[in-house]
Amino acid sequence: MDSNSTADCPSLPWRAFSNTTMWGVAGLCRGFLSALCHAECHGKEEFTELLDSRKDLLQRTKGLITVSNHISVMDDPLLWGILPMRFWNKRWSFGSYDICFQTRPLSLFFTMGKVLPCHRSAHSQFGGLGQPAITEAIRLLSKGPFPVDHHRASPELQRWSRQNVCVDPFSDLPVAYTTDGQDAHLAPSAYTCNSNSWVHIFPEGKIHQSPRKTMRYFKWGIARLILEPQECPDVVPMWIEGFDDVMHESREFPRFLPRPGKRVSVTFGSKVDSDSVFGEVRSRWQKLKAKVEKSNPDSRDLPVGVLSDELLTNKEAVELRKEVTMKVRNLVLEVRRSRGLPDEDPKEGLVDTWLEEGPQREGHMKDDSWVRDI
């Protein structure tokens, strides 16, 4: 079995099934927003032009990250129904492993929908900054293809079966990785067609429905996506409103149905000057990485998106991630401010502030917000 296997793209049936899933969901979302909601979009033309400029794979020189607040279980994919239905407008995102990948039908559906399986530390021992989903996202934001040289699935899991549905049944290429040693997922970064891709992330990591339209603190995974790709990705901050009315956490039966007739809005900020905003911190990251690699042979020659334990836990590295994460959060706050909302309390962005919630992880909170750990 060739451990350096890569390819231009997955098999034609796999691509067709994935495109059908993406287009089907996008069509439903677009229909719901246009026919059953009062939807408005700001900054759409500029963002659409950016996506159009990226349609030619050979012309892409860097990845694209979109980042937004998270206010309902329907944010993704519903918000993308606001965009024109063009075949290159397809994002990658993260999905909670303990929710999206618990059955074979769900696993296959979300895999076809370009969702990476992400373990949450509160629910799994396999969570954290070093998990395979983060590695895959970093590689998707870089120029590939990349062989599966991290968390490689065992040989028997490289082939499709009724119990192993997240690998390409029409290809013998061994490009599956595992998130926990028991599962297998096709590694999208092993394909040239996924070079310099678009990745969307909700850094809050939880649904947060606040009457004051504030955000929780951002988790540090977003920092790895900016610091570690080969080239600093383009970053577009976003702000969404009204989706919490479509699927509010206090809704009663039938909970699974989105509520029509609501007013929703999606605001795309301008593309960030990544070199100006993140160039200096990326330079500091590279210097730190070189210093650690020089003193610790185990940290040397690691593939893209894979870090040694020292680089994951080093105090200076942690502080860098905190700094980058706060920069990203401030970018989203700028878009929020453009919607006429008052500045939030700076303490809203600090982890310590949210520790005051105590052991309650979700539900109706003391500050009158609703939180769902999803």
Regions found by a protein language model. Give the residues of each.
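A cross-family acyltransferase "interaction/gating" segment
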Residues: 7-8, 15, 105, 175-311
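Intrinsically disordered, low-complexity cytosolic loops and termini enriched
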Residues: 137-187, 301-309, 346-357, 361
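Catalytic core of membrane glycerolipid acyltransferases/transacylases, capturing the structured
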Residues: 11, 56-132, 136, 144-165
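Eukaryotic N-terminal targeting leaders
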Residues: 1-19, 23, 27, 52, ...
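Helix-to-loop junction immediately C-terminal to a conserved catalytic motif
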Residues: 29-70, 171
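Fungal C-terminal region signature
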Residues: 263, 268-374
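Surface-exposed cleft-lining segments at the edges of enzyme active sites
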Residues: 118-126, 164-176, 207-213, 315
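A transmembrane-helix-recognition feature enriched in membrane-embedded lipid enzymes
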Residues: 2-47, 104-113
